[in-house]
Amino acid sequence: MLEDYYPSTTSYYHGGIDDDLYTAKWGMVMTFLDLNDSSLTPFEGTHFALIGFKSDKGVYINNGRVGAVESPAAIRTQLAKFPWHLGNQVMVYDVGNIDGPNRSLEQLQNSLSKAIKRMCDLNLKPIVLGGGHETAYGHYLGLRQSLSPSDDLAVINMDAHFDLRPYDQTGPNSGTGFRQMFDDAVADKRLFKYFVLGIQEHNNNLFLFDFVAKSKGIQFLTGQDIYQMGHQKVCRAIDRFLEGQERVYLTIDMDCFSVGAAPGVSAIQSLGVDPNLAVLVLQHIAASRKLVGFDVVEVSPPHDIDNHTANLAATFIFYLVQIMAQHS
C-alpha cells in the first residue's frame, strides 16, 4: 500500500453532463483510479495520471508565502471546465493526492516517488499538481526509480530561480530540489542534464551563478534572453539540449510568470516569461516524444486573484496533454 496516498472521491466538475464527446469537458471525461488496486495491469496506448502533492512545507522552510497546499483542488477545478478534444482514445485518470500534514517533507517526497513509480509501471504518464517546488524532487525520484541506472533523464525547469541551493545546513526545502538531483547524479557518476528557462538575475545570488558556470550539464536562459530570442530560437536551444537524450522531465514553477499573469504564487515576480510564448515552448517539448512526466507547482490559491494562476496552470496542462497525445 502506498503511504500518504488518498485516492480521489470528489468530482471537481459541476456543469451539465453530456454524452457527446464533441461537447465534453475534462471534468466529464476524467476517471477516478486507485493506485492501490492490485488488480490493475499496465495500460496500452498513451494515457495520463493526475496526482496532487498537497505540501508547501518546503515553501515554509524557505520563508516563502505558504498556500500551495491548496493548489491541487484549485487547478483541478479550472481544468475540469476545459473542453475535451481527444476523443475516447486517450484517458486522463485522477488518481488522488499525496497528503500528510503531520509528515516530514522527506517522507512526503518519498511517498510521491513511490506513487510516480506505480504510475510508470502502469504505463501512465504522470502529471503532478504541486504543492511547492519540493514536488520536483519527489517526482524526479519516482521517474528515476522506474528506469534502469544507465537510462538518461534530462530535466527542464521553467522557473525564475535555479533552486540549486545547498541543503546541508537547513535541510531540503522548495529551493533545493535540483541540487538534490545534482548530488544524486554525482553519487551515481551520472551527468545531471538540467536546463532552466526564465531565470531572473535579481532572484539568484552569485553563488548560484558560479555553481552553474562550473557545472557541465547545466544551462539556462534568462527571462530577458527568452524575450529577445523569441520562441523559435528558444525551441532550437531546447533541441540542442535534448540531442542524444531519450527522456525529459518537465517542471513548471508558476513564479516564472509576472504578477500580472500569475498573482497567486509563493514568490511573486515583477518580470516574467510571456505565457503565450511559454505555451509554444511547452508544445515543442511535448512534441519531442521524450517527455515522460511533468508538473506545475507553486500556485498559491490564498494569494490568487479570480483564479488567474490556477487557470494558467491548468491551461499549460491542457496544451501539454493535447500535444503529447497527438504525437504518441
UniProtKB/Swiss-Prot annotation:
UniProt GO MF annotations: agmatinase activity; formimidoylglutamase activity; manganese ion binding
Record key words, sorted: Histidine metabolism, Hydrolase, Manganese, Metal-binding
SUPFAM superfamilies for the chain: Arginase/deacetylase
Claim: Aminoacyl-tRNA synthetase is one of the keywords in the record: no
Amino acids binding Mn(2+) 1: 133, 159, 163, 253
Domain of life, per lineage: Bacteria
Cofactor binding note of this UniProt entry: Binds 2 manganese ions per subunit.
Biological role: Catalyzes the conversion of N-formimidoyl-L-glutamate to L-glutamate and formamide.
Protein name: Formimidoylglutamase
Organism of provenance: Streptococcus pyogenes serotype M12 (strain MGAS2096)
Lineage: Bacteria, Bacillati, Bacillota, Bacilli, Lactobacillales
